Amino acid sequence: IVEFRANGLAGDPNNIQPGSLILVPGGKKVVPVAPPPVRPGATDIPPASESGWTWPALGLLTSPFGPAHPLGIDVAAPVGTPIYAANSGQVTFVGGNPCCSYGYHVIIDHGNGYETLYAHMSTFAVESGAWVNAGDVIGYIGLTGRTTGPHVHFELRRNGVYQDPLNYLP
């Protein structure tokens, strides 16, 4: 683990700090995090834009779309924070590998060539084939896949071309 380059420890176990995320080569076990209880009448859904798009989570934009991050954006929030459908559509994928890349993730087809991806989930709140509305909870923020901290990685594609989500979100 100390020698595993992705951990950035330079071979020195003294570089491990409390709260550090440590990758275990070949590790497979993921401990699911229970979602927080839903409060009756909760109104924590992010506001929608005039075109119907809404933020995938309430949190801090930590990685905007651009040359260093050309596929999407990252919104940081605590593990267990709800992840919302950014627009209405049909869930086309629920799954993923907890150790690699996107980790647990969901893909939604919004029609007219639009598709969104939500990555690094701890748990899912939808099944493949389900229809969702903008603002519906589809999962919860986690630490699955390649991640440096709890966040949702959000991609928006139109006809297979990556779009800057900030051009669509309120």
Segments (PLM) and residue ranges:
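LysM (lysin motif) carbohydrate-binding repeats in extracellular/periplasmic proteins that recognize
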Residues: 1-20, 100-102
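Short histidine-centered loop motifs in beta-beta connectors
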Residues: 7-9, 78, 94, 111-135, ...
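Surface-exposed, glycine-biased beta-strand/turn segments
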Residues: 17-103, 134, 163
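Short glycine/proline-centered loop/turn elements that form peptide/ligand docking sites
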Residues: 101, 125-128, 137, 143-148
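Zn2+-dependent peptidoglycan hydrolase active-site motif and core
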Residues: 86-125, 150-155
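Short, glycine-/polar-rich solvent-exposed loops and beta-turns at beta-strand/coil boundaries
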Residues: 9-17, 67-68, 145-148
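Short, exposed beta-strand-loop hairpins at the edges of beta-sheets
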Residues: 143-146, 154-158
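Residue-level recognition of beta-strand microenvironments
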Residues: 64, 94-95, 124, 141-144
